[in-house]
Amino acid sequence: MVRSPSLRVDEPDQCDETEGDLEGKAEVGSGLLGASVGRVGGLELHQEHNRSEDGDIVPANLSPDYKAAEAAFRKSRDPSERMEWLREMLRTIPKHKGTEHLQADIKARIKGLAEQLESATKGAGHGGPALVIRPEGAAQIVLIGPPNAGKSSLHTRLTGSAAHVGLYPFTTQYPKAGMMPHEDVHFQLIDLPPIAQEHPVPWLVNTLQTADAALLVVDLGEPSCIEQLQAVRSMLGQQRVTLTERLEATADEDPFALRLPTLMLANKADGMADFDAELLALRELSGSRLPVFAVSAATGHGLGDIGPWLFQNLGIVRVYTKTPGHPADKHRPFTLRRGQTVGDVARLVHQDLARSLRYARVWGRSGFEGQQVGHDHCVADGDIVELHA
C-alpha cells in the first residue's frame, strides 16, 4: 500500500482558536474583496475595499451587521439557514458603488440556492431527485472525480447503498447520500456526478458548499488520468473551489470561495503491476500535493483506512451525555470538532439548554473525574458530560 502523508492541520494552542478553524470549512479565494484579515468563519474579517464595474478600487465599508451575517453564513451547514443568512447579508450590505459586485454575487447565490431548495421540496413530494443534501453524521464528505473512476462503486462498498454502477460514463446524475460507519459514528458520504468539460453540472458547486471534505477518486489505469485530474481542478477553480491538503484558518477575501480539504483515492489499485511508479508519475506530472490512499472498490483493499483518516484529520470529537444519577448514554455520541466546548455540546442537545446552562460536570481526558466546568471548557474525544441548567 502506498504510504499516504497526513493532511496537515495547524494546531493552535488555545481552544477558542481551534473552533473557528475546524468547525467550519476553511474557505478562501482571490475573490471580490481586498485587505481582509481574520479567522475562518468571518468572525474577525475586516474587509476594506471592492472593485467597481470599471475596475476602480473603492471603499466597501461593510457594516458590523453585514459582517455578523456573513460570519453566520460561513458557519452554517444547513441549506435553509444559509439562505436566511444570505438574505440578511443582502439586506445589511451598504448599497453603493463599492459593493456592486458583492451584491450581484449574493443575489446569484440566493437564486441558485433557492432553486436547489425548491428541487428538494418537489423531490420530496413527487419522488424526484433532491439537489440539496442536508448534513448528517460526524461530517459530510463528497465523492468527486472524472468519469468512470469508480466513485459509485466505492460509495456502494463504503455505505452499502444502492448507488447505480455502470460501465458507461456519467451514470450518476444526481447526489446520492449514504452513511459510512466508523466505530460508533457515521460519516455522510455523497456520491456526485462526474466532473468533465463535456458534461457540466450547474448545481454541483452549490452542493459542495455544505461539505466538510472531499474524496477525489482517480483511476491510475486510465491513460488520460493526468488530463482528467487537471480538468477537475480547472473546472472547480473556475467556480472558486480549491481542493487542498491543508485544513487551516486563512485570511479570507471572498465569502463564497471554498477550500475543500481533500484525500485522493487511487482506485483500482488491484489492477496495477507497479502502483508506486504510477503514483510517483501522477504526482510529478500533475503537481498534486494531496494525500493519497491506494484503494480497490472491487476487493476492498485500503477502504478500512478511510474512516480513521477522516476521523483524525477532521478533528472529530465524540461526547457522551448523562443525566444526574444515571449512567452515560454510550450508544449515540454527539460529534463536535477539536476545540469545541461544553457550550457547543449544550447547543447540540437543545438551543434552550444552551441559554439556560449554568455549569457542567465532565469525566474524561479534558478534566478530572466529575470536574465542574463552565461554558468555555474544551471537550476531548470520549468525554462524558453532565449538563446542569
Predicted regions and their residues:
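Short glycine-/polar-rich loops that comprise or flank the Walker A/P-loop
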Residues: 175, 185, 210-214, 258-262, ...
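A conserved segment at the C-terminal end of the G1
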Residues: 152-163
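Intrinsically disordered, low-complexity, charge-rich segments with an acidic bias
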Residues: 11-24, 46-54
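Short beta-strand-centered segment that lines the nucleotide-binding/catalytic pocket of NTP-utilizing
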Residues: 163-178
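Switch II of P-loop NTPase G domains
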Residues: 125-131, 136-138, 171-175, 187-215, ...
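Polybasic, low-complexity intrinsically disordered segments
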Residues: 33-50
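C-terminal-of-GTPase-core extension/linker across diverse P-loop GTPases
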Residues: 55-56, 70, 74-144, 149, ...
